[in-house]
Amino acid sequence: MSLGLLESQLRLKVFGRLQVIRQHLRMTNHTVKDGECLLTKAGCAGVITLNRPKALNALNLGMIRLIYPQLGLWEEDPETYLVIIKGVGGKAFCAGGDIRAVTDAGKAGDRLAQDFFREEYILNNAIGTYKKPYVALIDGITMGGGVGLSVHGHFRVASENTLFAMPETAIGLFPDVGGGYFLPRLPGKLGLYLALTGFRLKGSDVQKAGIATHFVESEKIPSLEQDLVAMKCPSKENVADVLDSYHNKSYAAQDKPFVLAEHLDKINSLFSASSVEAIIENLRCDGSSFALKQLQTLSTMSPTSLKITFRQLKEGSSMSLQEVLTMEYRLSQACMKGYDFYEGVRAVLIDKNQNAKWNPELLEEVTDDYIDSYFTSLGNSDLKL
């Protein structure tokens, strides 16, 4: 072998090793810290435990990259019959995505702003199309990304500790993770109301709204989990029977009327308008204390987010989950290039002074052409499911 050829091969080896190191460094910037997401096998079940209690189990990219492939392995494993996902810490199932990290990445032009949304939505789709029973124990705060980890699965078990909301219009975003799919499929205009106002549902109301499938008292959830993992080769029907049994014993919560029951007629009529502006006008004309409260709430939200969200749910009502997630990825990337998302995060999560200065500031300044741009195809960069 000539000296020149040997030197050439050595350079190639060194270059290849440097490429591997660079790739590793890029990946470890967003990998999961030890123990942030635990993946275990218990009896017949694969168990996902979100383990960031100090961050209210907020979902980061590293956790997504652990959960997604493991779901695929369990789906093909003949010894795994169901999947259970839960959070630790006593306060939250999952309070959302790691918005701070996404915000910083968006400002810096880091590809995390693309990767996070793309891989999160791919995970949402995997949950929504999962072949085996998927049980989310949403015993605590469940917002944003936490909704995406639960609502598309077969079973969602709420407790008195559950706090559900999709508050994205307050931070210049939109109710993503498939919100355009499940929200317009709630009864009447309830989903649109929740999406625009960010109204919070608690406890058994989460089940009454149709977001959770079952309600079980928090103290009984460990026993429920034990009964689920102890089953022998359970079918989806067997899992449902166990969940139904626990739910049916929770009479106290079922006896309470739905928190929005007295307002549903107004919600269905006032929010059935053909535009956000028309909804605002309906609320003004109604003049009831309920309507005036909604006006006050909507006045604090990003006008751009309100219009994006209205169209998102309107179009999503006739789309498949895959089509919705593709649409939402386009919206996410448009928001990353805009202004309101960063301003909303500053006002709500960083400075916490709630005084966001939206741009455009008024609903009438948000043109149809501007909203159209948010829904434009990304071509080769579109989400592929």
UniProtKB/Swiss-Prot annotation:
Localization (cell): Mitochondrion
Major location (coarse): mitochondrion
Pfam families: ECH_2
Positions of substrate binding: E120, G145, E168, D176
Pathway the protein contributes to: Amino-acid degradation; L-valine degradation
GO terms for biological process, alphabetical: valine catabolic process
E.C. numbers: 3.1.2.4
GO MF: 3-hydroxyisobutyryl-CoA hydrolase activity
Top-level EC class: hydrolase
Keywords: Branched-chain amino acid catabolism, Hydrolase, Mitochondrion, Transit peptide
GO cellular component, one term: mitochondrion
Reactions this protein catalyses: 3-hydroxy-2-methylpropanoyl-CoA + H2O = 3-hydroxy-2-methylpropanoate + CoA + H(+)
InterPro entries, sorted: ClpP/crotonase-like_dom_sf (IPR029045), ECH_dom (IPR045004), HIBYL-CoA-H (IPR032259)
Function statement: Hydrolyzes 3-hydroxyisobutyryl-CoA (HIBYL-CoA), a saline catabolite. Has high activity toward isobutyryl-CoA. Could be an isobutyryl-CoA dehydrogenase that functions in valine catabolism. Also hydrolyzes 3-hydroxypropanoyl-CoA.
Family label: Belongs to the enoyl-CoA hydratase/isomerase family.
The protein, known as: 3-hydroxyisobutyryl-CoA hydrolase, mitochondrial
Organism: Xenopus tropicalis (Western clawed frog)
